[in-house]
Amino acid sequence: MWDIEVSSSDISQKDIEIVCETMKSNWLSMGPKVKEFESMWAKELGINYISAVSSGTAALHLACLCCEFTYGDEVIVPALTFVATANAVKYTGATPIISDIESKDNLILSIEEIRKNITSKTKGIIIVHYAGYTYNIEEISKLAKEYNLYLIEDAAHAITSSYNNKSLGTYGDLACFSFYPNKNITTGEGGVIATNNKDFHEKIRSLRTHGMTTETWNRYNSSISTYDVNNLGYNYRMDDLRASLGISQFKNMKRNKIHRKNLVNKYRELLLGYKEITIPFLTNNTDSSNYIFVIFVKNPILKEKMITDLRNEKIQTSFHYTPLHKFSYYKSKNLLPIVEEVS
């Protein structure tokens, strides 16, 4: 239907061959390929511990469990994000405090909103690196420490992003990445959790596999044949098939980033002359993954005409995102003027 899609998975012949090799190996579940994929990410981020899981949402849920969010707790989240960010908080029984973004130029959780929304019930902050950008991350990290709050980075958009030569995903207590098919690299479904906290890492390893003390691959390669269950865990494992695709995709990740950057520069060059269009992040200093390219069209009639005209040319567009507090489940009368203006 579309000549140009909003996103499409770039699956090469090499990707297919590597996955087929794993299919022939007779080990399909979580095993050596998952371990290899985790090691690649640990080296890439310069972080001590990586755990591969079944999705970015699973990563967020496990991160929230590590922080022991529970009933009566509050966790500050941005209004401009995919719903999984808030859902992961709700899974624990805690309440997501949906907060406004910084500005039309920087679509990131506002540090002033964070300050305003901190209460005696606040236990954590989840910052979303929207479109692969961040803003005030160093100050937000300091603020979290000042108030003894956990900081989780939702880095689903931020594969390869960095700020001040430090990878996004290494500023908080935990960080969650997603490899959904529309992301910069894909495993079909999947994600990883990054942390430097050994206790968190060990808890994640247990929780992702039903709370078991050993994993199938470990038992296969040792004399240990039994296990204990010491947590109420989940089936959040990544399998070796998906990890194999991730390993292959990983090798082209930097080249993909350069290509995206060139496209962003071209789009900006062509669109900056139109007063009806606003382009965010023009002065933002993040070395971005350029996950998505976002524009604002203030006139709603013009916006719909642009969408229709592009559709007629078989060019797909998308809306990222409806603010959380506008969904039926999270409906709120709270006024969040900046995110409401940009949406």
Question: Which residues are covered by each model-predicted region?
Answer:
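Phosphate-binding glycine-rich loop
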Residues: 27-74, 88-92, 98-100, 166
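N-terminal "arm"/small-domain region of PLP-dependent enzymes with the aminotransferase-like
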Residues: 1-28, 32, 228-230
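Conserved coil-to-alpha-helix start sites within the AMP-binding
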Residues: 81-86
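Active-site phosphate-binding strand-loop segment of PLP-dependent enzymes
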Residues: 104-187, 192-200
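PLP-dependent aminotransferase class I/II
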Residues: 34-39, 47-48, 112, 124-128, ...
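Helix C-cap/helix->beta junction micro-motif
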Residues: 92, 146-147, 313
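Short beta-strand->loop structural element characteristic of the AMP-binding/adenylate-forming
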Residues: 95-105, 318
